[in-house]
Amino acid sequence: MIGEKKKCIGLIFGGHSNEHEVSISSAKTVFKAFKAQINRERFTVKAFYINKYGDWLDSDISEKILTGEIENYKTKKQEIFNQEKINFLDGIEFQNIDVWFPLLHGFNGEDGSIHGLIRFTKKPLVGCGIIGSALGMDKILMKTIFSNHKLPQVNYLVFQNEDLNDKQVKNKIINEILKKLKFPVFVKPSNSGSSLGISKVKNESEILLALEKAWGIDPRILIEEGLEVREIECGIIGNSKLITSEIGEVNYESDWYDYDSKYHSNNKIIIPAEIDSKITNEIKEIAIKSCRALNIFGFARVDFFLEKSSNKILLNEINTIPGFTKNSMFPMLWEASGLKIEQLVAKLVDISLDL
């Protein structure tokens, strides 16, 4: 707006989670959106890349990573600070940031870690707070709260900090799965995103390998009963008043919606999803209720299953920093709802300033 001081956006991306590359792709989209003509009078952007070792690189280098001038930059010569320094908030690069926009998918970012760090700057951030972020990242805690709020979910089991090197423990877990769930089942680490560490298990012989795969990421393991379902997603933005996007559906070619399906396949995206208006409204209501239950605001993507045989709505999970890649559903949902990506990022900043 003419005469109004431009807001400086601090875009944080990369990180040392296993979703590092996804974060870079998301940041490229958001960076480009802020640089678009429609946003030039309102915003400037400073990018801050965190490499896989946890080192923060300065904004000049970080911007070149986003524009493609530099690839796989790993030197520490241009860092603002590293893990041994604690006075990083005094750095001149941080002083002029008006709003932070973290795009760190996965642990040490999306789990509330970066939100806690940003709190020390006393500047607003795009997204929800520490508690909502932590709960949204932890599948076990999330599902426990959903259960307490009587929100519909698939049947599931939880195993926490079990010693998989102990044969008796392994047998106990397998027996409980056989007793309480029906195949196929999905074995998931509690703290992970983008379907990393998840396995679809079709019979007893596949359980152990799936448990070990999930255990390698997180010793807290969630096991869900697999059903014949449609993958449905809903975007959320807002603070005290949450607004829902159009409902979308993902049709994927693979056996299930795994990492490759999300980022490397030619999935068919249907927006709005071809479902009954009554079901659509119920999904939107549950999406808002689920975010309220976890104290999630700002923006999020809520994922659902719609059982094919019964049209039963089943809440899957909430993603508090959804992807902004070219294949990501969140920006597509909002574009179908009337907000192009350039308008969406500006709207998210406005929401953060309204808190």
Curated annotation (Swiss-Prot):
HAMAP family, sorted: Dala_Dala_lig
Binding-site positions, ATP: 178-233
Reaction catalysis annotation: 2 D-alanine + ATP = D-alanyl-D-alanine + ADP + phosphate + H(+)
This protein's name: D-alanine--D-alanine ligase
Residue span(s) of domain ATP-grasp: 143-350
Subcellular location: Cytoplasm
Species name: Prochlorococcus marinus (strain MIT 9301)
Function: Cell wall formation.
Family in the record: Belongs to the D-alanine--D-alanine ligase family.
Keywords, ordered alphabetically: ATP-binding, Cell shape, Cell wall biogenesis/degradation, Cytoplasm, Ligase, Magnesium, Manganese, Metal-binding, Nucleotide-binding, Peptidoglycan synthesis
Cofactor or coenzyme needed: Mg(2+); Mn(2+)
Pfam hit, one: Dala_Dala_lig_C
